[in-house]
């Protein structure tokens, strides 16, 4: 980036943020003393050395172990060498002697080895081995390894959370030009975690981080410019930031389909997290294994898929995946044959890359009409892997697979028409197939749709649509793996570690993370923020989630204004948010709350008839609302009757009705009958 342009952008940021009162309102509520951001290098090292001597950082255990394995193996993994005091001494010498700064070949090699392990496997045992190598590399002055260790302190990896130590190490690394450290300091400043809450400073950190190459900073800035958070809303600037990240993600996805991450919503089942459908329960997993060994082919294929990509809380394990696929393939499963072909086509530790073997299994699956097998053969011919390049054959197989609804084949057809590979360029057909594939969540199809909308290729240009699509692609980055580690941390009771991971994802624009962070803050279990900060920050995050379409968050904002949590009581604003949730999202809770406000005239004009209508709508919208609505209506009718008794002249009414002369001496039986009929009507509504 041009230095002058960077300086101008920073000045604009400072000017805009100084006009924003969010930081001022928030800082007035801060009472605790924040850690200064200007700490000398020697003090940093002295502090870290003290920590190690006290034993606060020398027992590093793996608290992120997969719960499925943890229930069977209760032992804890330990990283050897993390307690080595030489790490701090060498780092201290490294920073104090600029002339002698150098990353040794051995340290660089150790870091590369650790990084390779993380890229090739997602198992916790392998992660532990990787961090052991990072520790040794950091001992030798490797800056990237130091970044890894600072991250471990920040996020509480392996039970070693120490935010103060992380901040001081980040500050030292930032002075050496580390863009990851710049991003981390920006994140901490934006929340006021261990540092002063300062949005202007956070934006400056993010700007320098993005200029240095931080994809996270790029994504954060994209989200801020898209939503107008402490900057002037600017779709084109957001597009520029998001596109850079999306290009990076698309390049990774073209080499691998990536690993989908389960984004568990803490707001849905807070009382029973172990039953969450996004995470496979240990007992159910054991039952599936039993069925698979008994010969259940469908279960064998399912377990193979789960282990292949590491879903539902299971570790990625290529050996187990291949084991189950081979058993199912032997029983004649076309899907299993296709997945075996896929494993050999891509290559991994259990199934080394082998085009001939891939062709064999893809052909076996395709002969049974399997869409995955047909798509696999198309890929072999398209790329010329083990066979000559033949776009005609590739097109034929892609079309057959696409007709069966396989999204990857639909994407490949779209790409052929988009790029003109073996066919005439046809942007309308390209858009058609990209759109079809995107409906199933195919990430590269979403990326190319974003490209078309961003450039106006084959469609009318739309910045907003392009940004939303790019944002979806960006959220498939490797950083999304923190959803799983944050969830396990929360489940294990490590609330601070969970919160800080969700908070970073929330800062990057993930709506689920914004809701989860607000939920944790609202529970008042977090210790990394002062109690006076919890509700204001939770309100801020609920608001961001609501803007992204979360109905529950919208109702929460109404609740905060109704009760005065983190803000002043404001019934009118509460009613506004309840109305939005009721009208736009059809929220039964919002309808009920709004009905109550109309019933009592809180923030809006009292309207009994509208209150009745909203209560009825709430009952019709959600079965769970039937009982609360029944009692609310009973109370409303009772109060209405008492009101009539107190404020109306019933003598005149009875005289006007002339019940004795009109109905006869048994008029009281008629009234009783009417009351019984009304009760039957109410009971019918209750059970409807």
UniProtKB/Swiss-Prot annotation:
Topology with respect to the bilayer: Single-pass type I membrane protein
Membrane-spanning ranges: 663-683
Subcellular location: Membrane; Cell projection, Cilium; Nucleus speckle
Pfam family, one: Sel1
Cytoplasmic topological domain: 684-688
InterPro entries according to UniProt: Sel1-like, Sel1_AlgK, TPR-like_helical_dom_sf
Extracellular side: 19-662
The keyword Nucleus belongs to this UniProt entry's keyword annotation: yes
Segments annotated as Sel1-like repeats: 107-142, 143-178, 179-214, 215-250, 297-333, 334-370, 371-406, 407-442, 443-478, 551-586, 588-623
Signal peptide segment: 1-18
PANTHER family cross-referenced by the UniProt entry: PROTEIN SEL-1 HOMOLOG 2, SEL-1-LIKE PROTEIN
Family: Belongs to the sel-1 family.
Protein name per its UniProtKB record: Protein sel-1 homolog 2
Gene giving rise to this polypeptide: Sel1l2
């Amino acid at each position: 980036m041009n230095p002058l342009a960077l300086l101008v952008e920073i000045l604009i940021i400072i000017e805009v943020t100084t006009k924003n009162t969010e930081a001022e309102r928030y800082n007035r509520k801060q009472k605790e003393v924040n850690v200064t951001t200007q700490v000398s290098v020697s003090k940093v090292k002295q502090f870290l050395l003290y920590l190690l001597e006290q034993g606060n950082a020398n027992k590093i255990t793996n608290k992120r172990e997969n719960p499925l394995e943890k229930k069977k193996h209760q032992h804890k993994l330990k990283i050897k060498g993390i307690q080595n005091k030489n790490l701090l001494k060498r780092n201290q010498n490294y920073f104090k002697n600029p002339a002698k700064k150098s990353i040794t070949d051995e340290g660089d090699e150790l870091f590369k080895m650790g990084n390779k392990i993380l890229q090739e496997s997602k198992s916790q045992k392998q992660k532990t081995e990787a961090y052991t190598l990072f520790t040794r590399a950091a001992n030798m002055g490797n800056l990237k390894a130091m970044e890894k260790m600072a991250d471990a302190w920040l996020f509480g990896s392996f039970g070693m959370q120490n935010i103060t130590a992380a901040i001081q190490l980040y500050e030292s690394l930032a002075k050496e030009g580390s863009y990851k450290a710049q991003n981390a300091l920006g994140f901490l400043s934006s929340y006021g975690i261990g540092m002063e809450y300062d949005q202007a400073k956070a934006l400056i950190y993010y700007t320098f981080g993005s200029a240095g190459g931080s994809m996270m900073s790029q994504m954060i800035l994209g989200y801020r410019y898209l939503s107008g958070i402490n900057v002037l809303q600017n779709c084109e600037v957001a597009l520029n930031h998001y596109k850079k990240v999306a290009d990076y993600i698309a390049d990774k996805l073209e080499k691998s389909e990536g690993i989908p991450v389960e984004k568990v919503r803490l707001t849905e089942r807070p009382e029973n997290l172990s039953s969450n459908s996004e995470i496979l329960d240990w007992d159910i997993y054991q039952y599936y294994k039993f069925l698979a060994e008994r010969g259940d082919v469908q279960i064998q294929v399912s377990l193979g898929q789960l282990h292949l990509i590491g879903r539902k809380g299971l570790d990625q394990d290529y050996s187990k995946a291949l084991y189950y696929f081979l058993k199912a393939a032997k029983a004649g499963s076309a899907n299993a044959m296709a997945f075996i072909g896929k494993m050999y086509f891509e290559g991994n530790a259990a199934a080394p890359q082998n085009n001939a073997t891939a062709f064999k299994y893809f052909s076996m699956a395709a002969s049974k009409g399997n869409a995955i097998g047909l798509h696999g053969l198309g890929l072999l011919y398209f790329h010329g892997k083990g066979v000559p390049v033949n776009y005609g054959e590739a097109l034929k197989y892609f079309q057959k697979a696409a007709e069966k609804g396989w999204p990857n084949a639909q994407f490949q057809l779209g790409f052929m028409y988009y790029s003109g590979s073996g066919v005439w360029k046809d942007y309308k057909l390209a858009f058609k197939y990209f759109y079809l594939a995107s409906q199933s969540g195919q990430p590269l199809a979403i990326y190319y749709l974003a490209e078309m909308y961003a450039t106006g290729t084959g469609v009318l240009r739309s910045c907003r649509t392009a940004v939303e699509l790019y944002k979806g692609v960006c959220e498939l980055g490797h950083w999304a793996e923190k959803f799983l580690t944050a969830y396990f941390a929360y489940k294990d009771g490590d609330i601070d570690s969970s919160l800080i991971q969700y908070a970073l994802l929330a800062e990057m624009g993930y709506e689920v993370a914004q809701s989860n962070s607000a939920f944790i803050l609202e529970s008042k279990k977090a210790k990394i923020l002062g109690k006076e900060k919890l509700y204001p920050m939770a309100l801020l995050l609920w608001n961001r989630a609501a803007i992204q379409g979360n109905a529950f968050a919208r109702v929460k904002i109404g609740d905060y204004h109704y009760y005065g949590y983190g803000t002043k009581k404001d019934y009118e604003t509460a009613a506004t948010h309840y109305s939005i949730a009721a009208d736009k999202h059809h929220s039964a809770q919002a309808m009920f709350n709004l009905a109550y406000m109309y019933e009592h005239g809180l923030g809006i004009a009292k309207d009994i008839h509208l209150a009745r209508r909203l209560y009825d709508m709430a009952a019709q919208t959600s079965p769970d609302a039937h009982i609360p609505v029944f009692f609310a209506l009973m109370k409303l009718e009772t109060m209405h009757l008492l009101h009539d008794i107190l404020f109306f002249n019933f003598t005149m009414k009875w005289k006007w009705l002339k019940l004795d002369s009109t109905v006869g001496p048994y008029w009281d039986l008629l009234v009783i009958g009417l009351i019984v009929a009304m009760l039957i009507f109410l009971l019918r509504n209750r059970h409807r």
